[in-house]
Amino acid sequence: MPANAHDVERIETLIAYASANAEAYREAANDAEGFRAAAPLAHRAQERQAVAAHLQAYLRAGPADESSGDLTLRAPVVAVRRAAAPTDAEVVEAAVRDEGELQAAFEAALDDRALSAPARETVLKAYVAVRTGTDQIRDLRRALRDGP
């Protein structure tokens, strides 16, 4: 098990954020009109679910049993704002806004001096995947805004 109750509380909060973000991305992918936006949004949903699973595995097994594989290769509180028939650009814009909240939660955990070293390593690995996904969604937003 993790080193202390503080680690568990912090990681459970991140699991909730990542799970909610995954669900928001699934909904956004369903709302998207074209493959150009739907596919990357669905991929982000899978990645966010992988982040949540990574953190859950840490809580179940503890740091000694955690695999050291690259989290991004294991691709399997946030809400997409719904509107009537949103455009792909609007759907992606909502996802980008939600990314900021998720990223801030991970950054707060990494800044937490009370977090144990094994928990911090687990959170950092998940944060790298979150940050990469954030950058890719922002790139998609720019591409949709700037046109084909």
Indicate where each model-derived feature is located.
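Membrane-interacting alpha-helical segments
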Residues: 1-8, 75-88, 140-148
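Alpha-helical bundle segments that constitute or directly flank the non-heme di-iron/ferroxidase center
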Residues: 2-32, 90-114
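Alpha-helical scaffold segments that form or flank carboxylate-/histidine-based iron centers
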Residues: 6-14, 33-54, 88-92, 117-132
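Conserved alpha-helical segments that form or flank metal/cofactor-binding pockets of metalloenzymes
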Residues: 39-73, 136-144
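Carboxylate-rich helix-loop segments that flank metal/cofactor sites and access channels
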Residues: 57-103
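Preference for long, well-ordered alpha-helical segments
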Residues: 98-148
